[in-house]
Structure formats: structure tokens, C-alpha cells
Amino acid sequence: MKRFTSSTGSFGSSIASLGNDSIKKANSLTSGILGKQASAVQEDREKPAIDPVPPRDTERPARILSLDGGGVRGYSTLIILKKFLLHLKAQSPDKKDILPADYFDLIIGTSTGGIIALMLGRLRMTVDEAIEAYQQLSKKIFAGGLASAVLDGSMLSSEKPGLGLGLGIIKGRELDQYMNMAVTTVMPGETSMYDAAKLEGYLKSTIGQQKYTIEREDALLEDEDKNNCCSAIVTAKQNNATAPHVMRSYVNPKDLTDDKIKIWEAARATSAAPAFFVPISIGLSKVKFIDGAVTGHCNPSELAREEAEAIWPGRKIGLLLSLGTGAPQEISLAGSNSSKLVSFIALSANTAQVHERVSRYFNQVCDGQSPYVRMSVEHSIDSIRLDDYEKLDQIAASTESYLGTENIKTRLDAAIALGARTNEQVPATSFPGRMGSRSNTLQQPLSPGGTGA
């Protein structure tokens, strides 16, 4: 009987190798049995081979990647990361491509930075795969929608109470928030300028096409393979938008939850910017989640440090690479409606404030040997709205120009050197305690190569 089973399996494989005509003939002679078996063999052969996740060394200092939110401006972070990995590859002995999920131990992001974090970490995509997916996401999701109605002036008329701009200089980040306010004011209730169902469909499709989650578009966020990179995204509960809510692919001993959240649900939650996408209800309790940037954590590098401390108590941090999406160069407001933008002005400046706190903290406790590096294209992409997918080429050009400057090349080399130290087991600095105690007398130090926000 065992021999017969083996022969049948071998014969099924042979039939499959003969092609469709032979399968049809075999199918008619065997009431479909061999045809079904051959089809199953063919399907197995068509599935891409999944490379095993290499063992992770948890004894060496940790490498962390933090990704800011910023809509289409997040494209810039992928270009910076690609340059970093190419330089890293050039300096490695074997000159092999480097997978972000294997190089970094923790990748955390907010908003579209959260989507990128899931792509690179949980889904184990290469940076080129993530760039292609991000381009497609931006074009498919942001084409159309209500944004044009807001921007063409029909919803910004001063004749409508409370909607007149009355503003002086106003740039992309401030305009993003004003659009939120305009739509919310005109359309009561939970409104959105873009189709959440379209976004969900694209996310599911992308997840189901990746080798690591092939044909599993509903794969859970929590990763069964503990060797894989830890991935985290920053969201907020709609009924408590002042506090960040971190969704994780790993277990945080200080925040044990069993939500059974799917990858696509996490991606939807972190990208649910008010008015751009409706909140998403997750779990049996149907808690509504929104974009974590509303909590003031558009730059999640501070949370990244705290997450690392919770996951690996006492473990040293060798590199914390924080990638931003630009910061406003000037903000000038005038008119009676200025107060409506106050909350967002604080938010738009928050990436710089978080950078200052993290930089100050590390330099204070590391005695000049900080593992923290911040890179962000300044004053050239900040005027681009988060949904302006037609500006991807401009974002790429500005980022390449930024990377070509000497001080940024120096900063890039500093980040690579910090990462190399983790391989050599050179002692880095561990950081006990939380960020609550910060010295106000210490001047803001520069991240390697200068400041960034």
C-alpha cells in the first residue's frame, strides 16, 4: 500500500510535467482523480520558495529604524533607506543585498511610515519592492476623491461660515490639516476624502502576493517566526486621541494584548488620518482606530527607544536611524480663523520637537557616543500635500539632492559606522529608565552630521 501511494504521487508529478493535454486525458480516464492531483502539484510548484528567516542575534546591540508619517512624502524615507543599504552593501565583505528585516531588529512607523514599516519588517520586502508598492499605493489610492473639491476653492469660500482661509503663508502640512477641518465642517459625521475600501483592497492584495505571506491576505500581525524583525505601527483610539496605541508583530511584556489583529487592519489603522480616511473598527469590541500622528507621534523615534527597552531589557542600542519626511520652513498665520490651525501647528512642529528630545537624551547619557542618527529632507518637500501623488518625482529629486550634500554623506557614513559596531560587538550604551527625566539646561546636541527634523 505504501508503494502504491508513492507510485501514485510520482505518477501525478509526471502527468503534471507533461502539460495540459496529458492532464486532460488522464483526467477523463480516472474520473478526475489524477487531474486534481496534477493540478495540486502544479500549484505547489508555482508558489515561490520562501527563504528561511536567519537566526537573530539578540546579544549584540540592537539596530532600530524609525519612520515618520507624511503621506506621499514617505517616499523620501524609502529613497534615503535605499541609499543607506547600498552604502552598507558596498562596505560588506560579501557585497550581498541587505534585507531591511534582517539588518534591523525593530522597525516602527506612523501613518504611511507605519505601512512602510509593515512592508519592510512583517512582510520582509526588499526596499525596491517597497518602493514599487508605495508608488502604486500612492497613485491608486489618492487619485480622485474629495481633495480636489477642497482645493479648487469650492469648499474654501469665505462666504461659508467658518471656512474662509484668512491665512498668510501656508504650506503643505498646514494645508493638510486645513483640508481635514474643511471637510469635517462641511460634512458632519465621519467623512473622508478617499475610499477606505479601495485602500483595504490594495493592502490585502499586496500582502497576499508577498512570499512571506503568500495567499494569506488575512495573515495576523503577530509573527509566529520569532527570528523575524519586530514591526510596530503607531495608531490612536478615536475615543482617546491624546495617547498613542502601538500595534505590534511581537509581544511587549509591558503591554500584553491578544487582539488577533490582521496585518491589513494595522496598516489601515495607522493610515486613517482624520477626514482622509474613516476610522477602522477592529476586534470584538469594535474599537475605532485612527492615524497615530494625531497623538503627536508623527515622528515615532521616542516610542522606538521605549519599545526597545521593553522588548529587550538591558540590551544595548547600537543604532537608531530616524527617517523624516520634511519639516515646515515658515509658518505665518493671520485672520480670525487662525485659532482653528493651532492644534495642527503644534503637530507639524512635533517631528522637530521629538528629534530634539531624543537627540538630547542620547547625547546626555552616551557621553558623546550617541547611537541616534536623524535624516530628513528639509524645506523642499514640506510644501507637498500628503495626498499629492503627482509629486513623487519631485520628492525623489529633492531627496537625491539632499543625499548628495557633503554633510549628509557624513551623516550617512556615521549611521553605517554605528551599524558596523553592532557586528563587531563593540560596547554601545544601554539606556535604563524612561524619557521622563530630561535636563532642560542641556543645549540641543546635533545628531551625527548635524541636525534634522
Positions of predicted regions on the chain:
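Conserved catalytic cores and adjacent C-terminal regulatory segments
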Residues: 2-453
